[in-house]
């Protein structure tokens, strides 16, 4: 699973899983997990290139997240065995075209466009399962041009990882190499071409850094 981005078939992104993030965007705190899908073509591995800002969007936001890499196929997974299906983790960004998302929300349309552009799921690479000892105490941070914008802990999540796995697998089969993005803490905000975004997990050597550029059409 150390190259899950090459083998996984889907990215399941959980929304509004940190109460303060839900509030900062004016959303209600969910009573059950809420998720959407991102295409695997949106993966951008650390060191392989910049994040591209699409020409048709002027409000791109960073959202740092802990990613859960699924290690084996499962359906209707129960809470007690949920972690048996986890092979490891990744640090990820769920890049979001906020203006495109607002248009979709106003029209009651899916968020696919706002979340699915190429390079909109930057990742650090694979983090072995044993590197994170306490999944309920993982501090994530994100900076833009050296200024910290996001800092939050997984102990602030509304739904923990076993509950997310249980819920998602009750709807769709989770397969080896799939990635679950577990939500973002508060502090999301815009990035622009020419800026540099950096993210990390406190205490782990997982820092990742990406330049931001304006996309050039082929």
Curated annotation (Swiss-Prot):
Its cofactor is Mg(2+); Mn(2+). Gene3D superfamilies: Fumarylacetoacetase-like, C-terminal domain. GO terms for cellular component: cytosol; mitochondrion. It catalyses: a 3-acylpyruvate + H2O = a carboxylate + pyruvate + H(+); acetylpyruvate + H2O = acetate + pyruvate + H(+); 3-fumarylpyruvate + H2O = fumarate + pyruvate + H(+); oxaloacetate + H(+) = pyruvate + CO2. Belongs to the FAH family. Residues 1-18 form a transit peptide. The keyword Iron does not apply. This is Oxaloacetate decarboxylase, mitochondrial. It comes from Dictyostelium discoideum.
């Amino acid at each position: 699973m150390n190259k899950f981005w090459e083998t996984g078939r889907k990215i399941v992104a959980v929304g509004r899983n940190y109460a303060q993030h839900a509030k900062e965007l004016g959303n209600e705190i969910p009573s059950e997990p809420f998720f959407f899908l991102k295409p695997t073509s949106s993966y951008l591995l650390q060191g392989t290139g910049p994040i591209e800002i699409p020409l048709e969007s002027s409000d791109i936001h960073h959202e740092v997240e802990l990613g859960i890499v699924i290690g084996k196929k499962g359906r209707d997974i129960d809470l007690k065995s949920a972690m048996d299906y986890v092979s490891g983790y990744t640090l990820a960004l769920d890049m979001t075209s906020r203006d495109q998302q607002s248009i979709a929300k106003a029209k009651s349309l899916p968020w696919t466009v706002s979340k699915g552009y190429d390079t909109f799921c930057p990742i650090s690479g694979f983090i072995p399962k044993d590197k994170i000892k306490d999944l309920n105490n993982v501090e994530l941070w994100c900076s833009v041009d050296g200024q910290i914008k996001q800092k939050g802990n997984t102990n602030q999540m509304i739904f923990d990882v076993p509950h997310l796995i249980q819920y998602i697998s009750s709807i769709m089969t989770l397969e080896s190499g799939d990635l679950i993005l577990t939500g973002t803490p508060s502090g999301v905000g815009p990035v622009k071409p020419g800026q540099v975004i950096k993210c990390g997990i406190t205490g782990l050597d997982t820092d990742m850094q990406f330049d931001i550029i304006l996309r050039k059409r082929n």
